[in-house]
Structures are given as structure tokens and as C-alpha cells.
Regions:
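N-terminal nucleotide/polyanion-binding subdomain common to many enzyme families
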Residues: 1-66
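A short, gly/pro- and small-residue-rich
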Residues: 28, 32-36, 146-166
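Conserved acidic residues
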Residues: 38, 109, 134, 159
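Short glycine-rich anion-binding loops that position phosphate/pyrophosphate groups of nucleotides
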Residues: 17-21, 140-145, 167
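Short, flexible loop segments at boundaries between secondary-structure elements
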Residues: 113-119, 159-181
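Proline-aspartate-enriched helix->loop->beta-strand connector
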Residues: 128-142, 158
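Conserved beta-alpha
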Residues: 48-127, 131
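A short helix->loop->beta-strand "cap" motif at the edges of active sites that frequently abuts
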Residues: 10, 80, 156-159
Length: 181
């Protein structure tokens, strides 16, 4: 993430699982978002096995719910600011509180729930830009977050944007992480 902080456009980080690969075969917008993402992280044993079968190396599973906390730790160390967008208002605020407890000194400059009507989106985009976050975490679930990023990222003034699926629910304690296999 450090190398992307001074880039000319936002860096996008997306997790790829078998369900997303299958859906992208029918959804051109999702496929394009996956093709143009700066970093695709393998989130699922099916993707890992496919990569190995295709001779694409010995990748390891990197769930978005594990990468986001690592980026938050880096944000504290480097002074990067963070914005959380998505989930319900309650879960969003609980995720903010959980990150503040886990990472003292984290600069969470704003947050907004993900239940936004289309006509309200310009004000959400304005809010995110006014807060000037370095890192934007989008928790709308897949493929909604990827499609949202495809549509709105060009209007945002963020440096790194990661789709994090249900990670806010995990941080808030509403959902347990899947066990490691």
C-alpha cells in the first residue's frame, strides 16, 4: 500500500473467490473491475488450487478480513487516514469502535453505512472526499462492492480502496471468521 500512496489514481484491492470468478463470466462490469484491479488477493481454496493447476505459483489464501487489519496497522505506523463505507449503521459504528480499540491512534476520519439510495450517493461521495481518507474500505458484499467501486471510484480522492465484503460484521463481532483449513 505504501507504494500506491503517491500514485496518480486510486489503487484497488479485491478478493477473488470461486463464486466471483463464476459470476464474472456473466457480468462484464465485474469482469472488467477484476481485470483492472491493482491487486487481486486469492480468497478461497478453489482459487488457490486453480492457480496451482495453471502453474501460476504457490499462492496462499489471503482473506480480505485479514488484509484489512494489516492495512490498518500500517495506517497507524505511517499516519494514513481511514474511511469505512458499508454494512448497517450499527455494524459500521461497531467496526469503527473495534478498530479504534485494536489500533490505538488509528485516524478514522469518517464512516457511513452502506444502505444508501441512488439519489443519496452524491452526498456520500462528497462526504468521503471531504474527509480526505488515504484508505477507503468498502463493505457492501460481492459483487455490489466491486460494481460500486467501478462506478464511483473515479469520483473519489482516495489513494487505496479495498472491497472487504463482510469484514465489518466480523470486526463488530456479529459474524465469526471462517476457520482456516
Amino acid at each position: 500500500a505504501d507504494s500506491k500512496m503517491d500514485g496518480p489514481r486510486p489503487c484497488t484491492i479485491l478478493a477473488v473467490n470461486p463464486e466471483k470468478v463464476i459470476r464474472a463470466q456473466q457480468d462484464r462490469t465485474l469482469l472488467e473491475q477484476l481485470r483492472t484491479a491493482d491487486l487481486l488477493i486469492p480468497d478461497g481454496i478453489g482459487v488457490i488450487l486453480a492457480m496451482r493447476l495453471l502453474g501460476l505459483g504457490q499462492a496462499e489464501r489471503v482473506p480480505g478480513s485479514e488484509l484489512m487489519p494489516k492495512l490498518c496497522g500500517r495506517a497507524v505506523a505511517k499516519g494514513y487516514s481511514v474511511f469505512l463505507f458499508g454494512a448497517s449503521a450499527e455494524v459500521n459504528q461497531q467496526a469503527v469502535a473495534a478498530l479504534q480499540r485494536r489500533y490505538p491512534g488509528i485516524q478514522i476520519v469518517g464512516s457511513h453505512h452502506g444502505y444508501v439510495k441512488e439519489d443519496e450517493m452524491p452526498s456520500v461521495i462528497s462526504l468521503i472526499n471531504e474527509c480526505q481518507p488515504d484508505l477507503l474500505f468498502v463493505a457492501l458484499g460481492s459483487p455490489h462492492q466491486e460494481l460500486w467501486m467501478s462506478r464511483y471510484l473515479p469520483q473519489l480522492q482516495v489513494k487505496v480502496c479495498q472491497g472487504v465484503g463482510g469484514t465489518f460484521d466480523v470486526l463488530a463481532g456479529h459474524v465469526r471468521r471462517a476457520p482456516k483449513i
